[in-house]
């Protein structure tokens, strides 16, 4: 499904929170949306493998990487795993790598930057917790909509037909 965050903001201005414009699109989908699962991990993507192995139909993984752009949390392998398990998208408050490969995948991926250095994979982090970045607080179960213009968040799903 295609999402237009500008139009959604016009219609649902009272119901949505707008994430500060810190992100760029690195995935093959220009827009994506769904119910979010949150994870907090700093320069370590081990936990992301476990989460992305789950069925992601209708879901978006929101990763609070502390805003670090020193190491990439999402790589092509994680992107392919997410596509295989039908995730709608990934938002990374941090960096990604292997961007040419990510761009070929049928998934939305928004991140702050790209860097060739990979993350540790010790599995350090927490999931299903409140995370805050870009001027917005994210809770697992909220609904996120993203396109090349921006990212918005709503507590309930928006009627988009």
Swiss-Prot record:
GO terms for cellular component: cytosol. It comes from the Bacteria. The keyword Transmembrane helix does not apply. Coiled coil: none annotated. Keywords: Cytoplasm. GO terms for biological process: negative regulation of RNA catabolic process. Pfam families: RraA-like. It is found in: Cytoplasm. GO terms for molecular function: endoribonuclease inhibitor activity; enzyme binding. The keyword Glycosyltransferase does not apply. InterPro entries: RraA (IPR010203), RraA/RraA-like (IPR005493), RraA/RraA-like_sf (IPR036704), RraA_gpbac (IPR014339). Homotrimer. Binds to both RNA-binding sites in the C-terminal region of Rne and to RhlB. Belongs to the RraA family. PANTHER family: 4-HYDROXY-4-METHYL-2-OXOGLUTARATE ALDOLASE 3-RELATED, REGULATOR OF RIBONUCLEASE ACTIVITY A. Globally modulates RNA abundance by binding to RNase E (Rne) and regulating its endonucleolytic activity. Can modulate Rne action in a substrate-dependent manner by altering the composition of the degradosome. Modulates RNA-binding and helicase activities of the degradosome. This is Regulator of ribonuclease activity A. The lineage of its organism: Bacteria, Pseudomonadati, Pseudomonadota, Gammaproteobacteria, Enterobacterales.
């Amino acid at each position: 499904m295609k999402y237009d965050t500008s139009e959604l903001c016009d219609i649902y201005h009272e119901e949505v929170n707008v994430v500060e414009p810190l992100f760029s699109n690195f995935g093959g989908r220009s827009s994506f949306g769904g119910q979010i699962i949150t994870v907090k991990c700093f320069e370590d993507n081990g936990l992301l493998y476990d989460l992305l192995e789950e069925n992601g139909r209708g879901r978006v993984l929101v990763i609070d990487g502390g805003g670090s752009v020193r190491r990439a949390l999402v790589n092509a392998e994680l992107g392919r795993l997410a596509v295989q398990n039908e995730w709608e998208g990934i938002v990374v408050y941090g960096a990604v790598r292997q961007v040419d490969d990510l761009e070929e995948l049928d998934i939305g991926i928004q991140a702050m930057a790209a860097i060739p250095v990979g993350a540790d994979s010790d599995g350090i982090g927490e999931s299903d917790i409140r995370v805050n970045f870009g001027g917005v607080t994210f809770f697992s179960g909220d609904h996120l909509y993203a396109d090349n213009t921006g990212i918005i968040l709503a507590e309930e799903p928006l009627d988009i037909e």
